[in-house]
């Protein structure tokens, strides 16, 4: 095949991306490499020469969704390569789950396996002779809107929580070199990104695997450590008038060091801290650190340093052996801590998790009932805290402009998981601001999730 033919009719790869933001970053890296090697990305099964499905395998519902997506791709296209967390899962006999259910897939890899995925693509769909490296931006190909992006700083996790199997799929913590992280952040800001969302399995543990060794960025030393990285990212973001938001922050002692940076405006006053529960006995069964009293003290101290701090967390209701008293402790904690944003999952057994062997498994209806009670309390807390913002003027990042006005997010709202700010008036909204702009909005109303306001 001639070079001209390759250029005019490049091989086409379809892509299905499932799962969490960490998986989304993996998808972006694969798509970036595909484009760099001259492949084009097809938006339909019919138009693709083969399909890559990036899967999730964390909970049973995600496993089924991934298996269904693989089945659909096989039916609609027939040539499918599977990657992601589900690709690393084995059944009781030690066979990989994907191949057992869908034996016609071309190849199966685990998560964060760019090299293996590309090797499989090359085997079943040879790459063209002329790479389109000049068509790939320095920031890479992104699956998020142009004005925000995820920045993954590490892979894997050193924790062994009893309800989780991520370490068995993604391995132990491996931190990215600090200079590499900073370069990616700079390229993203140069490409117009206005909000950088820092993610990992455990952001607070960044650098522990390399003993916090010192790297270099722009000719100056920079430790591979969360505090130093966050400070450098905040300084860089300020040069572009952009936001930096932190996710998956475990409440280690050194987290206290970044709260002053938030109060100074270096990074957003927003902490995503996965607490999971409040009762010490449940936390022990979960193999999680901390206890409710110490956590409450930490939260109070953080808010004294940074009064505008928004705290998001996730919890599990109905964990094996959870008594009504233990669950009530969790409800009391939520009310007293006044967490701004929370998510709650009814416990769901995950194949391969050690929590499956714990006694006291609760019926589905009990788990769901407790989740509903939890969310009722959490929404009351959220409504109270949001009501306090009425009358304030907030800086809002615009996500969408339509005939009804603008829709955006404040510093308290991460994309997809938190609330929204609805911006009035609708008249001439598209002439006053556009997606990706920052606008000042005076808040005029609130409910349990969202805010309403007018351009100030």
From Swiss-Prot:
Domain of life: Bacteria
Catalytic reaction(s) noted: L-aspartate(89)-[ribosomal protein uS12]-hydrogen + (sulfur carrier)-SH + AH2 + 2 S-adenosyl-L-methionine = 3-methylsulfanyl-L-aspartate(89)-[ribosomal protein uS12]-hydrogen + (sulfur carrier)-H + 5'-deoxyadenosine + L-methionine + A + S-adenosyl-L-homocysteine + 2 H(+)
Cofactor binding description: Binds 2 [4Fe-4S] clusters. One cluster is coordinated with 3 cysteines and an exchangeable S-adenosyl-L-methionine.
Gene Ontology CC entries for this record: cytosol
Residue ranges of every copy of the TRAM domain listed in the record: 387-456
Main location: cytoplasm
Residues holding [4Fe-4S] cluster 1: 20, 56, 85
PROSITE patterns on file: MTTASE_N (PS51449), MTTASE_RADICAL (PS01278), RADICAL_SAM (PS51918), TRAM (PS50926)
Keywords assigned by UniProt, alphabetized: 4Fe-4S, Cytoplasm, Iron, Iron-sulfur, Metal-binding, S-adenosyl-L-methionine, Transferase
Official protein name in the record: Ribosomal protein uS12 methylthiotransferase RimO
Native species: Cupriavidus metallidurans (strain ATCC 43123 / DSM 2839 / NBRC 102507 / CH34)
Taxon lineage: Bacteria, Pseudomonadati, Pseudomonadota, Betaproteobacteria, Burkholderiales
